């Protein structure tokens, strides 16, 4: 009996060992795989904006982090984590268990915003005295003083002998107060929201808190809103200039132009297609900027596509349908049912747009390697849908489904969980607005500020219809900053739609697709074949007739 049992145990051991080594998807690692735990408190859904901002900030440093609401804290052993970050997004009395867990935690701790005064044992050096308004932030070590677009509320704190690395200047001109304070590995940020530049200040302090010594500036330029009605000659002129300057860049392409009853595809603009191919072969990375960049009756490039801007909500209905509101339903249950059906419609609508866009670009040998939502507006479900097809996302992020006017860009590339595996390459500088005489002055101010942070993206987009001279000014300003130009093709990007697979690595493309991957490509092939066939037939018929006549003679 003993021998049989020992033999059985040996078999189990061998079985487990084989599975552990032969099946990499199965892990038998002990302990928690996450090094950072982010705990947060909220009292309403509006506060999800700051929670998502924090998630985006942490995603710049760590992929292995976990988000958890304070009410779930009793389900986690905090000491499984190397770092714990707490965000008080809303004022709240914390549970005894939550406070005890923080007090007993052995690792590095960072508190942000509300409720920090409840961690008295953990932060005995922190004294929260009240509130104040600030209109500037300062990071002395970075030689940086930055104006706020509006006054912000912060907690007025004193911290005894703790180190102060960030300051705020009071709006009433009465002096400065601490924003970022720490004693050894325990930190506190006194701001009551995380919109930039507060987010940038906290990000800078995260470098010390998370022991990340990365430094450097990344620059990128994106040519925006290139659709089938764009001027190919103007675009070619800019492409040749960027090639001459040896600057890699992105081109945000919209495959279809639509305005009222006018619909133009790339197949109707062969000169533009030739220019886009030239760009792709000479430094450009193609970005899919939606499919039509419009939803209702707006012109391509002006309208939204993946957000119902008129009603400030996700795409729940076909564009031609009268938009139903909450007031159209007698009960909350009926409205919830409408929303569920709307989410199903949105999924089909977006899947169709993404598939069609990739298929049409690929049919012209144009290979998109990242996605950008028109006006950066897209629902949380939208991010899930896009992530099934693209590994890279470009621009800024919409934080919640409550409004599209809640966008955020971190300082550096990030991989927040709500992007479902996609990497964000952020746009941080904005664009040159037509008719704004101070546009370059504003851009240069942003460049100067951004370049003072330890690690940052200096990234802008430019509309080609503004001409070559304006583009040269933007490039000149960016070239004055030390840093590397981002060549997205050098990153690992993956795009998958039905039978089409596009992958980049070290600047090269790997494209897998059937000979004719879509109805669009099939029709394009027939059209091209006819163009070649008709002259050929016209030549062969007279030649054959002449040959027959000569033989009869």
Question: Predicted segment positions?
Answer:
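A short, well-structured beta->alpha microelement
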Residues: 55-80, 439-446
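Catalytic grooves of carbohydrate-active enzymes
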Residues: 218-227, 344, 348-351, 355-366, ...
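Short alpha-beta junction capping motif
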Residues: 40, 78-122, 279-283
